[in-house]
């Protein structure tokens, strides 16, 4: 049995999948009296009612003309929600219970300092993530520098974590994990108490400089005081940079330079307690970095690479290939591990890219685990021109695998959509599976901003036929070839726009 494991808690009460391998395709299988399909390699996948509370187990009976075998698989099922009313009686003593959405206020003016996550290596990619609301599943909207000072106004527990409400300026609130405040701001004896300065930081913007180079354009914004909170938003041919909690409208000075083929103009609009910069481009945004260095906020706009030969669009470019996992990862019915399968695809893709003249950066070439947050950092440090993370998909409990399967490509930033669309089209052509689209998803490896970054879910490793295909060099090669075609299509489109 691959899934579920003995005594595993299921998270649904109606129907769920069960899969594993009989070791031979020459057998029939019934689970709890229901016939379950068996593939030629012995893998099986069933979509069955969840066992009742009174008999929480799967009874498997497999057999052919010569032998039979039985297996009892105990599982745990979630309890039935208690809908019994319990109205208080006269004379009952009731203890006040805070409402689940209660926000505990922080009294007075307390300004706290953000730090990088406790597990982070010191690197410019390491930021504190701020959300519009507390809890998991919320939008990751702001990516704030370590050392940013903000006002703490409230706290709340959500999704099992402690969150702090902070003001980016007087008109904008957001939420950060309590663990991402610097240690001196957190009371060790009173978890909901915060300590910090009582006076707001003063941030003044100086004269802005524009410093173009061959590969990027730096917009250098001198600021007195600590780094400001900021927000970056992309347009079709523009980037908006909003700095919170700053005063004085900046004066922009253009460095002596010839007409720039990529940067059209930079403008600034002062608003109460903030300044908005409009960066207008002659082409779509390709990549950028926000940097805090030497008392200045530097916004680095990356130029698209110049394609010397449109017939060989990858020649001379650097491509990061990221075989997903370990740690974690899904396992198929016959125990094909996702991390092993995508490593084979990644190595084949490396060879194909090399043949096309690309420089290839591999985030891993062995089965040793690589930290999730380190993968995009490896790519940025190599100044790669694209990042592709290779995965195989699986399902959460309660999703019917016979209805919901196919090929999917994911992105985080809008600049990555064209690469995602081109790669998804090639995957559909090569792998021949259902189109699950090119979609936004909050995935860590695709949150790097310096280059287009995507994650591919080529097939479902837990489906017997797709797992069997992924064991073959032919299908692995098809997966790799699809990504190559997507990259070629994307960079060819950049060549046309030069």
Model-predicted regions and their roles:
Residues 182, 325-328, 365-370, 392-397, ...:
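Solvent-exposed loop/turn segments at secondary-structure junctions
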Residues 15-19:
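A short beta-strand segment in extracellular, disulfide-stabilized domains
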Residues 301-386, 396-399, 403-405:
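Active-site histidine-acidic residue metal-binding/catalytic motifs
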Residues 142-148, 339-347, 351, 355, ...:
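Solvent-exposed, polar/charged alpha-helical surfaces in well-ordered, non-transmembrane soluble domains
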Residues 160-162, 250-252, 308, 328-332, ...:
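Extracytoplasmic/secreted cell-surface and envelope-processing proteins
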Residues 386-389, 396, 408-411, 437-498:
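Active-site-adjacent mobile loop/cap segments within catalytic or ligand-binding domains
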Residues 5, 11-13, 25-28, 37-320, ...:
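Short linear recognition/processing motifs and adjacent strand/loop elements at protein termini
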């Amino acid at each position: 049995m691959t899934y579920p494991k003995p005594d595993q808690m299921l998270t649904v009460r109606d129907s769920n999948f069960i899969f594993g391998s009989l070791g031979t395709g020459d057998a029939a299988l019934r689970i709890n009296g229901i016939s379950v399909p068996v593939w030629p390699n012995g893998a099986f996948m069933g979509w069955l009612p969840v066992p009742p509370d009174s008999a929480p187990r799967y009874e498997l009976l497999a057999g052919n003309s010569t032998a039979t075998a039985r297996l009892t698989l105990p599982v745990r099922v979630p309890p039935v929600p208690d809908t019994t009313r319990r109205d208080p009686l006269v004379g009952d003593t009731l203890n006040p219970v805070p409402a689940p959405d209660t926000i505990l206020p922080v009294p007075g003016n307390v300004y706290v300092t953000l730090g990088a996550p406790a597990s982070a290596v010191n690197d410019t990619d390491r930021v504190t993530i701020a959300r519009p609301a507390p809890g998991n599943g919320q939008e990751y909207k702001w990516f704030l520098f370590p050392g940013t000072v903000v006002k703490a106004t409230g706290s709340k527990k959500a999704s099992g974590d402690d969150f702090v409400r902070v003001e980016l300026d007087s008109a904008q609130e957001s939420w950060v994990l309590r663990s991402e405040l610097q240690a001196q701001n957190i009371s060790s004896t009173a978890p909901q108490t915060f300590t910090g300065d009582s006076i707001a930081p003063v941030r003044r913007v100086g004269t802005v400089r524009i410093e173009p180079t061959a590969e990027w354009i730096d917009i250098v914004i001198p600021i007195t005081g600590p780094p400001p909170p900021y927000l970056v938003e992309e347009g079709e041919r523009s980037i908006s940079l909003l700095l919170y909690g700053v005063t004085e409208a900046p004066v922009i000075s253009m460095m002596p330079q010839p007409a720039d083929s990529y940067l059209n103009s930079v403008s600034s609009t002062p608003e109460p307690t903030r300044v908005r910069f409009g960066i207008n481009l002659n082409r779509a945004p390709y990549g950028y970095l926000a940097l805090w260095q030497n008392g200045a906020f530097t916004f680095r706009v990356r130029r698209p690479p110049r394609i010397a030969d449109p017939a060989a669009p990858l020649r001379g470019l650097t491509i990061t290939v990221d075989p997903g996992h370990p740690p974690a990862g899904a396992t198929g019915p016959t125990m094909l591990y996702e991390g092993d399968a995508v490593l084979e695809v990644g190595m084949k893709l490396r060879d194909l890219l090399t043949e096309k003249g690309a420089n290839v950066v591999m985030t891993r070439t062995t089965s040793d685990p690589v930290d999730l947050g380190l993968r995009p950092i490896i790519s940025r440090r190599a100044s790669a021109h694209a990042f592709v993370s290779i995965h195989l998909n699986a399902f959460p409990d309660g999703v019917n695998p016979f209805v919901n399967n196919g090929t999917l490509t994911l992105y985080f930033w809008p600049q990555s959509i064209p690469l995602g669309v081109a790669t998804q089209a090639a995957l559909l052509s090569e792998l021949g599976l259902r189109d699950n689209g090119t979609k936004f998803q909050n995935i860590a490896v695709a949150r790097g901003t310096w280059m287009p970054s995507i994650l591919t879910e080529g097939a479902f490793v837990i489906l017997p036929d797709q797992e069997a295909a992924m064991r073959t060099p032919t299908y692995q090669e098809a997966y790799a070839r699809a990504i190559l075609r997507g990259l070629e299509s994307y960079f060819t489109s950049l060549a046309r726009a030069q």
